[in-house]
């Protein structure tokens, strides 16, 4: 067995959510105010990762107009059940002191 070194994804990949589907592993990470929304990486060995896409590419899924620095998508959660991937994510529109203006969403897909 090969030794896995942290971080498993080099660079800026906050709030990782990992799911295993058969022999495949997928990680979803936050993108904050950056478009397109949420990064998805894939691996079969937890060592070699490849960016396979951005699931949120339409305004109807992710409207980032008006969000400021460090706002936008926070902490996506990627799961899989009975042949369907589920991605839950929060869009932080604004935050002031201890007050957050957020919206939560769910998107589904049969494959990634």
Model region roles, listed by residue range:
Residues 1-112:
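Carbohydrate-active catalytic/glycan-binding domains of CAZyme proteins
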């Amino acid at each position: 067995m090969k030794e896995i070194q942290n971080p498993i994804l080099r660079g800026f990949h906050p709030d990782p959510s990992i799911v295993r589907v058969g022999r495949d592993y997928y990680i979803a990470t936050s993108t904050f105010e950056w478009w397109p929304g949420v990064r998805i990486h894939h691996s079969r060995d937890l060592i070699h990762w490849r960016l396979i896409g951005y699931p949120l590419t339409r305004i109807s899924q992710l409207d980032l107009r008006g969000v400021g620095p460090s706002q936008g998508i926070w902490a996506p959660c990627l799961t899989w059940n009975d042949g369907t991937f589920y991605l839950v994510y929060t869009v932080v529109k604004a935050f002031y002191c201890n007050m957050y203006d957020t919206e939560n969403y769910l998107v589904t897909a049969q494959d990634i």
